[in-house]
UniProtKB/Swiss-Prot annotation:
Active-site residues (renumbered): 9, 69, 141
Ligand binding (Mg(2+) 2): 69
Organism: Acaryochloris marina (strain MBIC 11017)
Location(s) in or outside the cell: Cytoplasm
This protein's UniProt keywords: Cytoplasm, DNA damage, DNA recombination, DNA repair, DNA-binding, Endonuclease, Hydrolase, Magnesium, Metal-binding, Nuclease
Stated name of the protein: Crossover junction endodeoxyribonuclease RuvC
Single GO biological process annotation from the record: DNA repair
């Protein structure tokens, strides 16, 4: 059975997305990238950009399930901004009536590298290896989103 998995790495400045297609043990990379919002733009407008662009990603790829990274931050100010963006993401996913799976950063690192405290490069190398990419996926937020999607596939 073919299944499309959309991985999301929520952020206000840059929201990463990655779409993979799976069929039994076969895996195909369909698309990855970021939804970017201008830093000096009003917060309401930035959230609107995320809202509209995420709808476009969902309409283009029609995923069967969405895997999203759970919120985990060190700086309080940044956490609040990301939480606002994450709220918009969850609203859009609810509007599309999509099942959502959430993973912590440690769960994602463990699934991809076998080590829950792996660094970003180790995770990106694992993503590149699993998807047979010639180079590490960029930007970082898109690579993180692909890692989330792969985690959902591994946990099936």
């Amino acid at each position: 059975m073919t299944k499309k998995i959309l991985g999301l790495d929520p952020g206000l400045a840059s929201l990463g997305f990655g779409v993979i297609c799976t069929e039994s043990d076969n895996l195909e990379l369909l698309d990855f990238g970021i939804i970017q919002t201008p830093a000096k733009t009003d917060i309401g407008k930035r959230l609107q950009i995320i809202y509209e662009d995420l709808h476009q990603v969902l309409n283009t790829h029609q995923p069967d399930v969405v895997a999203i990274e759970k919120l985990f931050f060190y700086r309080m100010g940044n956490t609040i901004l990301v939480a606002q963006a994450r709220g918009v993401v969850l609203l859009v996913l609810a509007q599309h009536q999509l099942p959502i799976i959430e993973y912590t950063p440690a769960q994602i690192k463990l699934a991809l590298t076998g080590y829950g405290a792996a660094d970003k490069v180790a995770v990106q190398e694992a993503v590149a290896r699993e998807l047979c990419l010639d180079c590490l996926p960029r930007p970082d937020d898109a690579a993180d989103a692909l890692a989330v999607a792969l985690t959902a596939w591994f946990q099936r």
